[in-house]
Amino acid sequence: MNPNQKIITIGSASLGILILNVILHVVSIIVTVLVLNNNGTGLNCNGTIIREYNETVRVERVIQWYNTNTIEYIERPSNEYYMNNTEPLCEAQGFAPFSKDNGIRIGSRGHVFVIREPFVSCSPSECRTFFLTQGSLLNDKHSNGTVKDRSPYRTLMSVKIGQSPNVYQARFESVAWSATACHDGKKWMTVGVTGPDNQAVAVVNYGGVPVDIINSWAGDILRTQESSCTCIKGDCYWVMTDGPANRQAKYRIFKAKDGRIIGQTDISFNGGHIEECSCYPNEGKVECVCRDNWTGTNRPILVISPDLSYTVGYLCAGIPTDTPRGEDSQFTGSCTSPLGNKGYGVKGFGFRQGTDVWAGRTISRTSRSGFEIIKIRNGWTQNSKDQIRRQVIIDNPNWSGYSGSFTLPVELTKKGCLVPCFWVEMIRGKPEETTIWTSSSSIVMCGVDHKIASWSWHDGAILPFDIDKM
C-alpha cells in the first residue's frame, strides 16, 4: 500500500469513528429527554439506605438520575409489639461483666456530667444507662455542693450502656431528682420526680412526651425506685414512697399503659418501711427487693400480680443484706418483720432462683464500701444461713454505693428465659473524700451458666481533681 492509500484508509477510519460517536451522542440525548419526560417512571437506580447522623439513625430512599441524587426521608416505623416478659428468670451460676463506664476517670479531663443514682434498663434492641445529673460537669465550679440530693438542676438522662455520662452522647429524658424508666417493647417510659419537698410531682413520659402526672399524696418527698421499672405485656409497674425516711411512710404501686396510669394500689405495711425497690419480671409477676430506711437490716420483699394484688414481707434469709448491719452470726432472719436497729440503709437488690436467692450487699457492715453477691440456699422462703456461693465485685477498701436489678429480654438474648443482671454504683467525692463534689460511676454484671472468679472492678479515679485544689 502506497503512502496515499494509507492516508485515505486512516482518514476513512477516523471519519467512521467520528460519525459513530455523533450518532451515540444523539441517541444519548434522545434517551435522556424521553426518561426525564416520563415523570420518574423510567430508568433509574433506586435504593433504601440507613445512615447515622451523630447518634441519630435516619432511613432514606435515594433515587439517582445520572448525576443527580434525590433523597427522601422515610419515617422509621415504631416497634410493633409489646414485650412479653412473662418468662422465668434464667438460672445463674455466676455473674460476668457487661459494662463499666469509668465516668469519673474520664471526667478528670472530659466533659462528663456529675451524677448519682445510675441504673440500667433494656429495650428489645439495646440497653441504656440512666442517671440523675446535677446540671454540672466534673472538674468545674458548678460541681460544688453536688452532695445535695434534690435541686432544680437535676435531670434524668441516658446513654447507651458502657458509655460515660458525657455531654456529647447523653440523651435528655426528664426533669427529675428521683426517677425510674423502662421499655414496653414499643417506646421508653420514664417517671421523673421533681419540685418542692412538700408538693413534688412525678411526670410520666412515654416516647419522650409527657402523658400523665402523679402529685405528692403525703406531702413529704415523693420518690421512686432509682432503678428500672418493669413492663409485662405492655403494662408497666413501679413503686413509689411518700412520707418520712425514718418512720412509717405511705407506699403505692402504679400501673401504666402507653404512659397513662390505668391502676394504682396502696401497700399496707404497718411497722415496715419500703423505699427504692429494685424490681424485675419473673414468671408473669413483678418481684421487688427494697430498702428499709427505718429499722430493718433485712430487706423488704414485694411481689406484684398483674391485677395489682400483692404480697409484702421481708427477705427470709438468715443473712442480712442492708448497710449498716450487725454480724451475720447474730442475725436470725424473718419473713414478716424488720430485724435490727441500725436504721438508715442503702438501695440494694436480690433475685429469686426457685426457693434460693442471689443477694447483693456491701462487704463493709458499716459503710458503703466493697461489694459482693452471695447465693443463699432456700433464702427466699426460709431463715437459711446456708451460703452456697460468693462472688466479689468490688474489694472492701474501694467505695461502692447503690445497687439494683434489671433483666435482658428474650428479644436481645434469643433465650427462653430472662437473664438476671445488676449494676453497682461507685460513689466518689463528698462526704467521704476531700472534694467539692459528689459523683459516681458504675459496673454492670449479668448472669451466666458458669462460675465467675471474684475480682475488683472498682472506680479507680485518682482524687482530688484540679477544681478541688483551688
Curated annotation (Swiss-Prot):
Residues of the active site: 149, 402
Subcellular location field: Virion membrane; Host apical cell membrane
Glycosylation sites: 39, 46, 54, 84, 144, 293, 398
Residue numbers binding substrate: 116, 150, 275-276, 291, 368
Signal sequence, renumbered to the chain: none
Cofactor(s) required for function per UniProt: Ca(2+)
Chain residues that bind Ca(2+): 292, 296, 322
Region (Head of neuraminidase): 89-470
Mode of membrane association: Single-pass type II membrane protein
Pfam families in the cross-refs: Neur (PF00064)
EC main group: hydrolase
GO MF, one annotated term: exo-alpha-sialidase activity
Superkingdom classification of source: Viruses
Region of interest (Hypervariable stalk region), ranges: 32-86
Intrachain S-S bonds: 90-417, 122-127, 182-229, 231-236, 277-290, 279-288, 316-335, 421-446
Intravirion-side positions: 1-14
Inhibition and activation profile: Inhibited by the neuraminidase inhibitors zanamivir (Relenza) and oseltamivir (Tamiflu). These drugs interfere with the release of progeny virus from infected cells and are effective against all influenza strains. Resistance to neuraminidase inhibitors is quite rare.
Keyword Glycoprotein: yes
GO biological process per UniProt: carbohydrate metabolic process; viral budding from plasma membrane
Transmembrane segments: 15-35
Keywords associated with the record: Calcium, Disulfide bond, Glycoprotein, Glycosidase, Host cell membrane, Host membrane, Hydrolase, Membrane, Metal-binding, Signal-anchor, Transmembrane, Transmembrane helix, Virion
Subunit structure: Homotetramer.
Domain notes: Intact N-terminus is essential for virion morphogenesis. Possesses two apical sorting signals, one in the ectodomain, which is likely to be a glycan, and the other in the transmembrane domain. The transmembrane domain also plays a role in lipid raft association.
Functional note: Catalyzes the removal of terminal sialic acid residues from viral and cellular glycoconjugates. Cleaves off the terminal sialic acids on the glycosylated HA during virus budding to facilitate virus release. Additionally helps virus spread through the circulation by further removing sialic acids from the cell surface. These cleavages prevent self-aggregation and ensure the efficient spread of the progeny virus from cell to cell. Otherwise, infection would be limited to one round of replication.
Protein name: Neuraminidase
